[in-house]
Amino acid sequence: MYVKNINLLNYRNYKKLSVELTENVNVFVGDNAQGKTNILESVYYCAFAKSHRTSKDKELINWENSTAYISLLIGKNRLDKKIDINILRDGKKAIKVNNIKVNKIGELFGIFNVVMFSPEDLKVIKEAPSLRRRLLDMELSQVNPNYYFNLVQYNKVLGERNILLKSRSFSEDILDVYDIQLSKYADYIISKRLEYINKINFYGDIIHREITSGKEEINFKYNCTVNLENGKFKDNYLKKLKDNIQKDREKGLTSVGPHRDDFSVFINNIDTKIFGSQGQQRTSILTMKFASLKIIREITGEYPVLLLDDVLSELDLNRKKYILRSIKDIQTIITCAGIEDLNDYLDDKVKIFNVSNGQILNQGRNI
C-alpha cells in the first residue's frame, strides 16, 4: 500500500498543493512551522477522518477560507483508490472513496492504513490510560471495522447507563438490560484487544531484542478491570457490574469495563511508565509501532504507510539505524529539519522535498 499523490486546498498553511510521492522513502525537509507536519497530518486524516493533533476540524482549514480539501490517490493490492475529503467549519465533513459517498466513519476504516510515530507518542507510555486505550482502539479499528462497530455500540450503551445512574432513581431491571448489552459488546472488545496485545508481544519481542542488541526483553500486559482467568468474561463482567451498583450510583458512572482498562509495558520486568528511563520509554513505543506494521501486514497482506514526524533527531544511533534498515519495503513519509543524519542510510530511491512557508520548493529530488 502506498500514496501516489497528495492534493490539498486551503488545508492549514497550504493554499494549494499537489505532490507526487515515490513508493519508497519520501523526506520533507524544512525549518519548524513551515508545514511539514501538516502534510503528514493530511495523510493520517484520510485513514481515520480525524487529526492526530487536534479534535477541532476547523483548525485544519486555512483561516481565510470556509472549507479545506484533501485528496489522496492510493495504490492498494495493485488497484488505485481515491479518497476525497471536504472539511467544513461547522464540524461537518464529506468523504468519498472512488467518488462514492461514505456515510459513516467506520466505512472509511481499512480503506487506507497508516502507522504514525511522532514525539508526542511518548505520552502514550508516560501519561493517562485513555491515551493507551485510544492507541489500541485506533489500531484495531483500521484493520477490523467490526471492532469499531462494537466500540461505538459499547460507548452508546455506556452513555445511556451513566445517564440512568445519575438519575439516582431507577429500576434495577432496567439496569440489567443495559448490563447485558454492555457485556456483549465488551466481550468482543476485550477479546480483540487481548489478541492484539498477544501479537504485539510476539513481534515486539523480536523487534526489541534487535534494537537493544539482545540486552533487553519487553512485555506488554493488558490490565483488565474484570477477572479474565476462568475464560468467562461476560459472566464475570455482569457480576462485577452488580457488585458495583452502589458505588456506580454514588458516582453516577460505570466503574468497570473496557473504557477503564489499560496496558502496561515492562522492560526486563520493570514497569517503564514508573521506572523506565526516557530512552526505554521511547524504545517501548518504537517497538509497539513497528510491531503494528507487522500486524497490519499479517492481517491485510500489505504494509501500511509509515509516517515519521520529526522523530529521528530524538533517537540514538541504534534506534535510528533500526528504523532506516526496516523501512526498505514500506512507503515511508519522513519530516525532519535536515538530512545530514540520513545520508549514510538512504539510497537513490529516496525523494527529498524542501518545504518553506506552505510551499514545496521542488517536486522531489534524489538524495
From Swiss-Prot:
Binding site for ATP: G30, D31, N32, A33, Q34, G35, K36, T37
Sorted UniProt keywords: ATP-binding, Cytoplasm, DNA damage, DNA repair, DNA replication, DNA-binding, Nucleotide-binding, SOS response
Gene3D superfamilies xref list: P-loop containing nucleotide triphosphate hydrolases, RecF/RecN/SMC, N-terminal domain
Cellular component, GO, one term: cytoplasm
Entry's Gene Ontology molecular function annotations: ATP binding; single-stranded DNA binding
GO BP annotations, alphabetical order: DNA replication; DNA synthesis involved in DNA repair; double-strand break repair; SOS response
Cystine pairs: none
Primary localisation category: cytoplasm
InterPro entries per the UniProt record, alphabetical: DNA-binding_RecF, DNA-binding_RecF_CS, P-loop_NTPase, RecF/RecN/SMC_N, RecF_2
Pfam families assigned: SMC_N
Compartments in which it is found: Cytoplasm
Domain of life, source organism: Bacteria
Job description of the protein: The RecF protein is involved in DNA metabolism; it is required for DNA replication and normal SOS inducibility. RecF binds preferentially to single-stranded, linear DNA. It also seems to bind ATP.
Similarity comment: family membership: Belongs to the RecF family.
Protein name as catalogued: DNA replication and repair protein RecF
Natural source organism: Clostridium beijerinckii (strain ATCC 51743 / NCIMB 8052) (Clostridium acetobutylicum)
Gene: recF
